[in-house]
Amino acid sequence: MGHSIYLADDEKSIRELLHSFLASDGYTVHSFESGDALLEAFRQEPAELVILDIMMPGTDGLTVCRELRSVSDIPIILLTAKDSELDYVMGISQGSDDYLTKPFRPTILLMKVRALLRRVEMDRGKTAAAVDELHYGDLRYSATENAVLRGNTPVALTQTELRLLSYMMKQPEKAYSREELLNAVWGFDSEVETRVTDETLRRIRKKLLHAGSTVSVSTIWGFGYKLKEAERT
């Protein structure tokens, strides 16, 4: 039996199309026409990945995403009919791992599903060999506490933000390309078009500033990003 996926979309035609497409690739798919139904099923038996339409009657996808993220770090993909920057930012801020704007090709969704589940498997394999602590500037990553801390205070990061920042802290002076970060943190191939790296790092930069950290995320135009310890005067 393949990985279990929960899918919620109030549009029956889309729900049935995606269900059939994912099931044909070997996944065990359970479809729901509302966010409330998905949440109820998840409480009984958690899935390994969730796909959510944002605009659903009743409990919308953003709320469901927030509820799921409060109890689980499973991969979450949001779907929306709006090509809205606000929807994208809201989705990432609620803890989603990626985002697709309708209409989209089912093959793109399948690539993202495969990549996210591959990342989960990679994370499990790395757990035993994981570094217990990392330090850069006034930041400390603790595997035991599953957090990045400034002093004794955790920086308020989502699990995806934590994975990304801790990955960059392993070699903080290194310049990371978007492609490397996509592969290392999300498991995506460089051909998968996504804004998720840029948006996640923008949020990390904002949160580090809010925490008063000397560490910031520096943009290397045309290439990617690196961590930088700011000079304090």
Language-model regions, residue ranges each:
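Active-site beta3 strand of CheY-like receiver
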Residues: E45-I51, M56
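Acidic catalytic/metal-coordinating carboxylates
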Residues: E33-S34, D60-T63, D87
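Charged docking surfaces used in two-component/phosphorelay signaling
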Residues: E16-S24
